Amino acid sequence: MSVAGLKKQFHKATQKVSEKVGGAEGTKLDDDFKEMERKVDVTSRAVMEIMTKTIEYLQPNPASRAKLSMINTMSKIRGQEKGPGYPQAEALLAEAMLKFGRELGDDCNFGPALGEVGEAMRELSEVKDSLDMEVKQNFIDPLQNLHDKDLREIQHHLKKLEGRRLDFDYKKKRQGKIPDEELRQALEKFDESKEIAESSMFNLLEMDIEQVSQLSALVQAQLEYHKQAVQILQQVTVRLEERIRQASSQPRREYQPKPRMSLEFATGDGTQPNGGLSHTGTPKPAGVQMDQPCCRALYDFEPENEGELGFKEGDIITLTNQIDENWYEGMLHGQSGFFPINYVEILVALPH
């Protein structure tokens, strides 16, 4: 920075201190300007918070959002294509239903019904993915562009205006000690910056119908999603009702117990007829077979942040994901969340 530039910065700082500490009066901007500045500030804050809340609405699981963001960042660093999308809850439910529907098979009512509903859930997850992309393209991205371009440019003009106001007020206070031409130039620069800032704010506020169009795109995307979701659910409802009707019309089978086998005791000479026991009964199961990843809580854990899963010592928690070296994601009593690894012991490990 040149000597003249350093000198000007010193003058601005001096004027700012005299206003804040000494109570000096600076040049006041008119009420219309202040009102536009207020509305622009509210617009800027609204855009940032609404973008954040919209993403949370579309992708409600904070752990999944964090993992997805990390994967996409690493893919970008490595020059790879964009990583997988957000794991929709409907897709996870569909996967479980389809899996157990296949295991149960077609010789019962529940298995095929699980398959039908699982397929409907898979279709819902695809429609949800389309909603995510539509909202990002037609709502979030335009708001991001508004924030990064127009609002940032206005903030630049306002900052420049404030600097020139301080410079003008400093020189005005020293009128008679500095050349009149220098004061006149400072006033011209201040007026020029005020006009540029005022014009940019006016144009933004005057064209706010663009933001209304973006809101309309958000609502229309949701409307289309719900229309398709209703259609999918209506179709699977018809199939389930038909399955119920057919099952109700079939004669109910009666349980037919198999003949019991007799227990034969040893004879007096210590031998057992026919080689011993002819009936061993039903073997007692050795214990509960845990066929899915799970862990046991070693201590109580009270959640302190949104998205964390609380539990009590001894609770058995179903594991769904490992976020990083310190956190697991799991489910307990129908609630999903993440929790510290060192609070639990693994019973069935997650697949690698």
Swiss-Prot record:
A GO molecular-function descriptor: identical protein binding
Assembly and binders: Monomer; in cytoplasm. Homodimer; when associated with membranes. Interacts with OPHN1. Interacts with SYNJ1. Interacts with DNM1. Interacts with MAP4K3; the interaction appears to regulate MAP4K3-mediated JNK activation. Interacts with PDCD6IP. Interacts with ATXN2. Interacts with ADAM9 and ADAM15 cytoplasmic tails. Interacts with BIN2. Interacts with TMEM108. Interacts with ADGRB2.
Residues with Phosphoserine modification: S262
Region feature (Binds and tubulates liposomes): 1-125
Family to which the UniProt record says this protein belongs: Belongs to the endophilin family.
Short name of one Pfam family: SH3_1
Species whose genome carries this gene: Rattus norvegicus (Rat)
Comp. bias intervals (Basic and acidic residues): 246-257
Gene Ontology BP, a term: regulation of receptor internalization
Residues annotated as signal peptide: none
Record remark: domains: An N-terminal amphipathic helix, the BAR domain and a second amphipathic helix inserted into helix 1 of the BAR domain (N-BAR domain) induce membrane curvature and bind curved membranes. The BAR domain dimer forms a rigid crescent shaped bundle of helices with the pair of second amphipathic helices protruding towards the membrane-binding surface.
UniProt function note: Implicated in synaptic vesicle endocytosis. May recruit other proteins to membranes with high curvature. Required for BDNF-dependent dendrite outgrowth. Cooperates with SH3GL2 to mediate BDNF-NTRK2 early endocytic trafficking and signaling from early endosomes.
Membrane topology: Peripheral membrane protein
Residue ranges of domain SH3 in the record: 290-349
InterPro entries tied to this protein: AH/BAR_dom_sf (IPR027267), BAR_dom (IPR004148), Endophilin_A_SH3 (IPR035824), Endophilin_SH3RF (IPR050384), SH3-like_dom_sf (IPR036028), SH3_domain (IPR001452)
Coiled-coil blocks: 181-250
Tissue spec: Expressed in the brain. Expressed at low level in the kidney.
Entry annotated with the keyword Coiled coil: yes
Outcome, altering L263P: Confers inhibition of transferrin uptake comparable to Sh3gl3 upon overexpression
Locations listed in the record: Cytoplasm; Membrane; Early endosome; Presynapse
Residues recorded as bearing Phosphotyrosine in the entry: Y299
Protein name as it appears in the record: Endophilin-A1
GO terms under cellular component: cell projection; cytoplasm; early endosome; glutamatergic synapse; hippocampal mossy fiber to CA3 synapse; perinuclear region of cytoplasm; photoreceptor ribbon synapse; plasma membrane
Keyword terms: Cell projection, Coiled coil, Cytoplasm, Endocytosis, Endosome, Lipid-binding, Membrane, Phosphoprotein, SH3 domain, Synapse
Location (main, coarse): cytoplasm
